[in-house]
A protein has these predicted regions:
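Conserved, structured core segments of small domains
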Residues: 51-71, 78-81
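Mid-chain, well-packed structural core segment of small domains
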Residues: 71-93
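A short, polar/charged loop-to-alpha-helix boundary motif
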Residues: 131-135
């Protein structure tokens, strides 16, 4: 029997609105500012799809980007996004501010995923899934 029900994944960042907008361009989910500080700065921003929060972004003072694949500030989580064509999706990602990691876990062009960084430095992956037909 489950102890709890999974709710969402939240990413720490210096600017939750900017990071939510970045991921909204990838997913087409709605950006919702959920919590403001006393001076009106967004503290918690959510990506919502059909009324369900999927990803949240939390403002963290003195945020430091993770280093990937190794380094003094290790990644603690990453997101995967399925796409029908890696090359087409990569072109679109780079246009909205993603950075392709200079280090890929394999140099085999037949691999089915690629690693990128979002504007706050979190690594995320595109995963080839040719069964997707609605993008």
């Amino acid at each position: 029997m489950a102890i709890a029900k999974y709710s969402l994944t939240a990413l720490d960042c210096p600017d939750p609105v900017a990071l939510a907008n970045f991921y909204s361009k990838i997913t087409d989910f709605e950006v919702v500012v959920a919590h403001l500080s006393k001076n009106g700065d967004p503290l918690w921003v959510e990506l919502v799809d059909n009324g369900v929060t999927k990803i949240a972004f939390q403002r963290v003072k003195n945020y430091v980007k993770p280093t990937w694949p190794e380094g003094p500030i290790p990644q603690q989580a990453h997101l995967d996004f399925d796409v029908p064509n890696l090359d087409i999706a990569e072109e679109k990602l780079l246009q909205i501010g993603a950075v392709k990691s200079p280090i890929q876990t394999s140099s085999d062009p037949a691999d089915n995923f690629r690693v990128y960084f979002d504007p706050a430095g979190h690594p995320f992956c595109l995963v080839s899934n040719t069964s997707i037909t609605d993008l």
